[in-house]
C-alpha cells in the first residue's frame, strides 16, 4: 500500500497490508533524529517484499550507500555457498588453501575459526593507508606473513577492517577468482541486485556520501570508551596508527574504496538489495530456490565462540562468519544471522520466522543507539508477522 497521512509525511515507499507498524516505527525513528535523515529500510517475509521505505532530502528508492562491515555478511554468504558446493570446508586448515599462511604459529587455524575472528590478525602495528586498506591482496599478504596477537583459535577479537581480506584470500586460492567477481556471478547478478563490491562508474551519481555523527556528550563518551589507545588492540583493529588512514565513517567517501570494493568494508548498495539477498539465502525468491540448504544455514548460524572480545572489549557471540543476531536482538528466533555495519547499517535473516531485514542510514550513529533503533524496527516487523499468525 502507498503511504499517506500527516504522521508519515517524511516516509516514502510502500508496505504490504499488515506491515504498517514498520512504517510507523520508521517514522518515529526519523522524528527522533533531530535533523533530516537519509535512510532506507526493507524487509521480505516468506520471500516476498513487505517493506520498502525510504526518507530524507536526497534519498530515493535506488540511492546507494556504503554498507561498511555489512559487506562481511555478503562475502560470507559467498563462503557459505562455496562450502555447500564442496569447494571449501569449514573444518579444514586455512593453510591448506593458503600455504604461506602457515607461519608464526598460525598453521593449525581452521577456516571456521578464521570466520569467527579467532585468527589474532586484527591489523598491523604500523597500520594501513586508505589506499592500502582498499587492496585486499596487499592486506592479506601482510597479515598472512605476520605473527598473531594471540594464539589462534583460543580467543576472539573483531577483525573490523581486515576479516574478509583474509577469508577472501582463501576464496581466491580455492577458486582462482576474486571475491567481487564471484559475488556478482553467483549472488547479486542472478538476482539483479543493486549491491556492489566494486561500484561501476555509471552508478556513481546515485551514491550518497556518508555524513558525520551529530555529536552529543553521551555519544562522544561512548566512542571514547570504545576507542582505547592507538597502540592497543582496538586502535590497531580500527587502523588508528597510520598517518594516511581515516575515520571509519569516512571510508566510503574515498573513490578507491568504492571502486575496489574491499570485501570487509567496501560494499555499496541499497537496503532493498540487502534484504533481498538475505531472503534469497534462506527462502525461494522470485521463482528461484533458496541459495542455501537448511544444513548449510545451520552450520553458519551456530555460535562458534562466545566470550570477551579482545577488540570490542565486551562479551560477544560470533556465529561462523556472521553475528549471532538473536544474541543482540532477543526478539529474533534462534538461528538468526547477519552482519551490521558501522554507523547503524544492518542486514540479517531470521529463517524460523521467514524474515529478512536491512536498514541503511547516511549519518553515522553510535552502536548503542543503532541497536535500539533496529530493535524497535524488528519488534514492529515481528508484530506484523504475528498479526498474520505465523511467527515462531
Cite the ranges covered by each PLM segment.
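Short, gly/Ser/Thr-rich active-site loops of penicillin-recognizing serine hydrolases
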Residues: 262, 283-286, 296, 301-308, ...
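Catalytic-site signature segments of enzymes, centered on catalytic residues
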Residues: 64, 123-206, 256, 260-269
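Short, conserved catalytic-motif segment at the N-terminal edge
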Residues: 12-68
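Active-site helix/loop module of the DD-peptidase/beta-lactamase fold
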Residues: 61, 69-70, 82-126, 144-145, ...
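Active-site Gly/Thr loop motif
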Residues: 210-269, 298-353
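Active-site-proximal alpha-helical segments within enzyme catalytic domains
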Residues: 117, 163-170, 261, 265-285, ...
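Short glycine/proline-rich turn/loop motifs
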Residues: 4-7, 57-59, 145-150, 250-261
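Active-site SXXK
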Residues: 26-27, 47, 66-92, 167-172, ...
Amino acid at each position: 500500500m502507498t503511504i499517506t497521512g500527516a504522521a508519515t509525511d517524511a516516509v516514502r515507499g510502500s508496505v504490504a497490508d499488515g506491515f504498517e507498524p514498520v512504517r510507523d516505527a520508521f517514522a518515529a525513528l526519523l522524528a527522533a533524529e533531530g535533523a533530516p535523515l537519509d535512510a532506507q529500510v526493507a524487509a521480505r517475509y516468506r520471500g516476498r517484499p513487505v517493506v520498502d521505505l525510504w526518507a530524507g532530502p536526497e534519498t530515493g528508492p535506488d540511492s546507494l550507500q556504503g554498507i561498511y562491515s555489512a559487506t562481511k555478511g555478503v562475502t560470507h554468504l559467498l563462503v557459505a555457498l562455496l562450502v555447500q558446493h564442496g569447494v571449501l570446508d569449514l573444518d579444514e586448515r586455512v593453510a591448506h588453501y593458503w600455504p604461506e599462511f602457515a607461519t608464526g604459529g598460525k598453521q593449525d587455524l581452521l577456516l571456521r575459526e578464521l570466520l569467527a575472528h579467532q585468527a589474532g590478525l586484527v591489523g598491523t602495528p604500523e597500520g594501513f593507508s586508505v589506499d592500502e586498506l582498499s587492496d585486499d591482496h596487499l592486506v592479506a599478504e601482510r597479515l598472512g606473513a605476520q605473527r598473531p596477537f594471540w594464539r589462534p583459535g583460543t580467543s576472539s577479537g573483531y577483525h573490523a577492517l581486515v576479516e574478509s581480506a583474509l577469508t577472501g584470500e582463501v576464496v581466491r586460492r580455492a577458486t582462482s577468482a576474486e571475491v567481487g567477481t564471484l559475488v556478482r556471478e553467483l549472488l547479486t547478478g542472478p538476482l539483479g541486485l543493486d549491491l556492489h563490491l566494486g561500484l561501476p562508474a555509471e552508478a556513481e551519481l546515485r551514491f550518497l556520501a556518508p555524513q558525520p555523527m551529530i555529536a552529543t556528550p553521551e555519544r562522544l563518551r561512548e566512542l571514547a570508551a570504545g576507542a582505547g589507545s592507538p597502540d592497543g588492540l582496538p586502535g590497531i583493529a580500527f587502523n588508528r596508527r597510520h598517518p594516511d588512514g581515516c575515520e571509519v565513517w569516512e571510508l566510503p567517501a574515498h573513490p578507491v574504496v568504492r571502486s575496489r570494493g574491499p570485501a570487509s568494508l567496501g560494499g555499496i548498495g541499497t537496503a532493498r538489495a540487502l534484504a533481498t539477498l538475505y531472503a534469497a539465502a534462506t527462502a525461494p525468491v522470485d521463482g528461484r530456490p533458496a541459495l542455501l540448504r537448511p544444513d548449510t544455514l545451520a552450520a553458519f548460524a551456530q555460535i562458534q565462540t562466545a566470550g570477551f572480545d579482545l577488540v570490542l572489549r565486551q562479551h560477544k557471540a560470533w556465529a561462523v562468519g556472521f553475528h549471532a543476531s538473536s544474541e543482540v536482538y532477543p526478539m529474533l528466533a534462534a538461528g538468526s544471522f547477519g552482519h551490521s555495519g558501522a554507523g547503524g547499517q544492518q542486514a540479517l535473516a531470521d529463517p524460523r520466522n521467514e524474515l529478512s531485514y536491512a536498514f541503511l542510514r547516511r549519518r553515522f550513529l553510535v552502536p548503542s543507539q543503532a541497536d535500539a533503533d533496529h530493535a524497535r524496527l524488528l519488534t514492529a516487523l515481528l508484530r506484523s508477522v504475528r498479526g498474520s499468525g505465523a511467527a515462531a
